[in-house]
From Swiss-Prot:
It is found in: Cytoplasm. Belongs to the class I-like SAM-binding methyltransferase superfamily. RNA methyltransferase RlmE family. Its EC number is 2.1.1.166. Keywords: Cytoplasm, Methyltransferase, rRNA processing, S-adenosyl-L-methionine, Transferase. The gene is rlmE. Pfam families: FtsJ. This is Ribosomal RNA large subunit methyltransferase E. It comes from Aliivibrio salmonicida (strain LFI1238). One of its GO terms (molecular function) is rRNA (uridine-2'-O-)-methyltransferase activity. Specifically methylates the uridine in position 2552 of 23S rRNA at the 2'-O position of the ribose in the fully assembled 50S ribosomal subunit. InterPro entries: RNA_methyltr_RlmE, RNA_MeTrfase_FtsJ_dom, rRNA-MeTfrase_E, SAM-dependent_MTases_sf. Its main location: cytoplasm. HAMAP family: RNA_methyltr_E. The active site is at K164 (proton acceptor).
Length: 209
Protein backbone atom coordinates (compact mmCIF):
# COMPACT_ATOMS: atom_id res chain seq x y z
CA UNK A 1 0.00 0.00 0.00
CA UNK A 2 1.39 3.40 -0.93
CA UNK A 3 2.00 6.06 1.67
CA UNK A 4 -0.66 8.26 0.07
CA UNK A 5 -3.26 5.49 0.18
CA UNK A 6 -2.39 4.74 3.79
CA UNK A 7 -2.69 8.41 4.69
CA UNK A 8 -6.07 8.67 2.94
CA UNK A 9 -7.31 5.56 4.73
CA UNK A 10 -6.06 6.85 8.07
CA UNK A 11 -7.71 10.19 7.40
CA UNK A 12 -11.05 8.54 6.71
CA UNK A 13 -10.77 6.49 9.90
CA UNK A 14 -9.94 9.57 11.95
CA UNK A 15 -12.85 11.53 10.47
CA UNK A 16 -15.23 8.63 11.13
CA UNK A 17 -13.90 8.27 14.66
CA UNK A 18 -14.25 11.90 15.66
CA UNK A 19 -17.64 12.26 13.95
CA UNK A 20 -18.88 9.13 15.76
CA UNK A 21 -21.76 10.01 18.10
CA UNK A 22 -20.61 7.39 20.61
CA UNK A 23 -17.10 8.86 20.73
CA UNK A 24 -18.59 12.31 21.30
CA UNK A 25 -20.97 11.02 23.98
CA UNK A 26 -18.17 9.13 25.75
CA UNK A 27 -16.11 12.32 25.88
CA UNK A 28 -19.11 14.27 27.14
CA UNK A 29 -19.78 11.79 29.95
CA UNK A 30 -16.12 11.42 30.93
CA UNK A 31 -15.66 7.83 29.76
CA UNK A 32 -12.39 6.65 28.29
CA UNK A 33 -13.75 4.87 25.21
CA UNK A 34 -16.87 4.40 23.10
CA UNK A 35 -16.83 0.71 24.13
CA UNK A 36 -18.65 1.67 27.32
CA UNK A 37 -21.88 1.95 25.34
CA UNK A 38 -21.66 -1.71 24.30
CA UNK A 39 -21.55 -2.73 27.94
CA UNK A 40 -24.24 -0.21 28.88
CA UNK A 41 -26.58 -1.66 26.26
CA UNK A 42 -25.89 -5.20 27.48
CA UNK A 43 -26.51 -4.05 31.06
CA UNK A 44 -29.79 -2.38 30.12
CA UNK A 45 -31.03 -5.61 28.51
CA UNK A 46 -29.50 -8.29 30.72
CA UNK A 47 -28.88 -6.63 34.12
CA UNK A 48 -25.57 -8.41 34.73
CA UNK A 49 -24.08 -5.87 37.14
CA UNK A 50 -25.54 -5.16 40.58
CA UNK A 51 -24.36 -3.37 43.74
CA UNK A 52 -21.90 -5.37 45.84
CA UNK A 53 -20.74 -7.64 43.03
CA UNK A 54 -17.18 -8.70 42.26
CA UNK A 55 -16.33 -8.30 38.58
CA UNK A 56 -13.31 -9.37 36.52
CA UNK A 57 -12.63 -7.21 33.44
CA UNK A 58 -10.28 -8.82 30.88
CA UNK A 59 -8.78 -6.65 28.15
CA UNK A 60 -9.68 -3.63 30.25
CA UNK A 61 -7.55 -0.80 28.80
CA UNK A 62 -8.17 2.07 28.37
CA UNK A 63 -10.77 1.45 31.08
CA UNK A 64 -14.23 2.29 29.75
CA UNK A 65 -15.78 -1.01 30.85
CA UNK A 66 -14.11 -0.82 34.27
CA UNK A 67 -15.39 2.75 34.73
CA UNK A 68 -18.93 1.66 33.97
CA UNK A 69 -18.72 -1.53 36.04
CA UNK A 70 -17.44 0.23 39.15
CA UNK A 71 -20.36 2.67 38.92
CA UNK A 72 -22.78 -0.26 38.83
CA UNK A 73 -21.28 -2.33 41.67
CA UNK A 74 -20.74 0.68 43.94
CA UNK A 75 -18.55 1.03 47.01
CA UNK A 76 -19.58 -2.39 48.32
CA UNK A 77 -18.40 -4.13 45.14
CA UNK A 78 -15.06 -4.44 43.42
CA UNK A 79 -13.64 -4.61 39.91
CA UNK A 80 -10.45 -6.53 39.13
CA UNK A 81 -9.04 -5.58 35.73
CA UNK A 82 -6.24 -6.93 33.53
CA UNK A 83 -4.68 -5.81 30.26
CA UNK A 84 -1.37 -6.13 28.44
CA UNK A 85 -1.47 -2.34 28.02
CA UNK A 86 -1.06 0.21 30.79
CA UNK A 87 -4.22 1.77 32.22
CA UNK A 88 -4.57 4.91 34.31
CA UNK A 89 -5.94 4.15 37.77
CA UNK A 90 -9.67 4.16 38.46
CA UNK A 91 -11.05 4.42 41.98
CA UNK A 92 -12.46 1.06 43.03
CA UNK A 93 -10.57 -0.90 40.36
CA UNK A 94 -7.65 -3.22 41.11
CA UNK A 95 -5.56 -3.30 37.92
CA UNK A 96 -2.93 -5.83 36.85
CA UNK A 97 -0.84 -5.08 33.77
CA UNK A 98 0.37 -8.14 31.89
CA UNK A 99 -0.28 -10.59 29.08
CA UNK A 100 -3.24 -12.72 30.13
CA UNK A 101 -1.90 -15.55 27.93
CA UNK A 102 1.17 -15.94 30.16
CA UNK A 103 0.86 -18.34 33.08
CA UNK A 104 2.67 -16.00 35.50
CA UNK A 105 0.21 -13.19 34.75
CA UNK A 106 -2.77 -15.53 35.06
CA UNK A 107 -1.44 -16.77 38.41
CA UNK A 108 -0.96 -13.18 39.63
CA UNK A 109 -4.53 -12.38 38.62
CA UNK A 110 -5.88 -15.48 40.36
CA UNK A 111 -4.03 -14.48 43.55
CA UNK A 112 -6.33 -11.45 43.74
CA UNK A 113 -9.43 -13.61 43.43
CA UNK A 114 -10.83 -16.25 45.74
CA UNK A 115 -12.42 -19.29 44.04
CA UNK A 116 -16.18 -18.96 43.53
CA UNK A 117 -16.15 -15.30 44.60
CA UNK A 118 -16.61 -13.63 41.19
CA UNK A 119 -20.11 -12.69 40.08
CA UNK A 120 -19.30 -11.52 36.54
CA UNK A 121 -16.42 -12.15 34.14
CA UNK A 122 -16.41 -9.76 31.20
CA UNK A 123 -13.99 -9.71 28.30
CA UNK A 124 -13.55 -7.16 25.54
CA UNK A 125 -10.20 -8.69 24.57
CA UNK A 126 -9.07 -8.76 20.96
CA UNK A 127 -5.70 -9.61 19.41
CA UNK A 128 -3.70 -7.16 17.36
CA UNK A 129 -5.34 -7.60 13.98
CA UNK A 130 -3.17 -8.38 10.95
CA UNK A 131 -6.02 -8.12 8.45
CA UNK A 132 -5.62 -11.79 7.57
CA UNK A 133 -8.69 -13.71 8.87
CA UNK A 134 -6.84 -17.04 8.79
CA UNK A 135 -4.41 -15.58 11.34
CA UNK A 136 -6.68 -13.22 13.28
CA UNK A 137 -9.58 -15.61 13.91
CA UNK A 138 -7.54 -18.35 15.67
CA UNK A 139 -5.83 -15.69 17.81
CA UNK A 140 -9.19 -14.23 18.75
CA UNK A 141 -10.69 -17.63 19.58
CA UNK A 142 -7.71 -18.47 21.76
CA UNK A 143 -8.39 -15.37 23.87
CA UNK A 144 -12.08 -16.15 24.31
CA UNK A 145 -11.21 -19.74 25.28
CA UNK A 146 -8.93 -18.34 27.99
CA UNK A 147 -11.74 -16.10 29.19
CA UNK A 148 -14.07 -19.10 29.47
CA UNK A 149 -11.37 -21.00 31.37
CA UNK A 150 -11.22 -18.06 33.79
CA UNK A 151 -14.97 -18.46 34.37
CA UNK A 152 -14.46 -22.11 35.26
CA UNK A 153 -11.86 -21.16 37.85
CA UNK A 154 -13.44 -18.17 39.57
CA UNK A 155 -17.17 -17.76 38.85
CA UNK A 156 -19.65 -18.26 41.65
CA UNK A 157 -22.64 -20.53 40.97
CA UNK A 158 -25.21 -18.63 38.87
CA UNK A 159 -22.52 -16.11 37.87
CA UNK A 160 -22.48 -14.35 34.50
CA UNK A 161 -20.11 -13.97 31.56
CA UNK A 162 -20.02 -11.58 28.64
CA UNK A 163 -17.36 -11.85 25.96
CA UNK A 164 -16.58 -10.25 22.62
CA UNK A 165 -16.31 -12.88 19.89
CA UNK A 166 -15.62 -12.44 16.20
CA UNK A 167 -17.90 -14.50 13.99
CA UNK A 168 -16.00 -16.94 11.83
CA UNK A 169 -14.24 -20.27 12.13
CA UNK A 170 -14.82 -22.02 15.49
CA UNK A 171 -17.51 -19.53 16.59
CA UNK A 172 -20.31 -22.13 16.61
CA UNK A 173 -18.19 -24.65 18.50
CA UNK A 174 -17.32 -22.02 21.10
CA UNK A 175 -20.97 -21.06 21.49
CA UNK A 176 -21.84 -24.70 22.18
CA UNK A 177 -19.04 -24.85 24.76
CA UNK A 178 -20.46 -21.82 26.57
CA UNK A 179 -23.94 -23.37 26.52
CA UNK A 180 -22.62 -26.43 28.35
CA UNK A 181 -21.66 -24.40 31.41
CA UNK A 182 -24.32 -21.65 31.51
CA UNK A 183 -28.09 -21.99 31.78
CA UNK A 184 -29.00 -19.08 29.47
CA UNK A 185 -26.86 -17.89 26.54
CA UNK A 186 -27.71 -14.97 24.24
CA UNK A 187 -25.92 -13.24 21.37
CA UNK A 188 -25.95 -9.44 21.35
CA UNK A 189 -24.89 -7.02 18.60
CA UNK A 190 -24.99 -3.65 20.38
CA UNK A 191 -26.06 -0.60 18.39
CA UNK A 192 -22.69 0.98 19.19
CA UNK A 193 -20.85 -1.92 17.55
CA UNK A 194 -19.88 -0.80 14.06
CA UNK A 195 -22.04 -2.53 11.46
CA UNK A 196 -19.09 -3.71 9.37
CA UNK A 197 -17.46 -5.41 12.36
CA UNK A 198 -17.79 -9.18 12.77
CA UNK A 199 -17.87 -8.73 16.53
CA UNK A 200 -20.79 -9.88 18.63
CA UNK A 201 -21.11 -10.32 22.39
CA UNK A 202 -22.06 -13.61 23.98
CA UNK A 203 -24.00 -12.96 27.18
CA UNK A 204 -24.22 -16.02 29.41
CA UNK A 205 -26.00 -16.22 32.76
CA UNK A 206 -26.63 -18.91 35.35
CA UNK A 207 -23.18 -20.50 35.62
CA UNK A 208 -23.69 -24.17 36.44
CA UNK A 209 -20.48 -24.47 38.49
Amino acid sequence: MSKNKLSASSGRWLKEHFDDKYVLEAQKRGYRSRAIFKLEEIQNKDKLLKPGMTVVDLGAAPGGWSQYAVEQVGDSGQVIACDILAMDSIAGVSFLQGDFREEAVLDALLERIQPDMVDVVMSDMAPNMSGNPSVDQPRSMYLVELALDMCRQVLAPNGSFTVKVFQGESFDAYLQEVRKVFKVVKIRKPDSSRARSREVYIVATGYKG
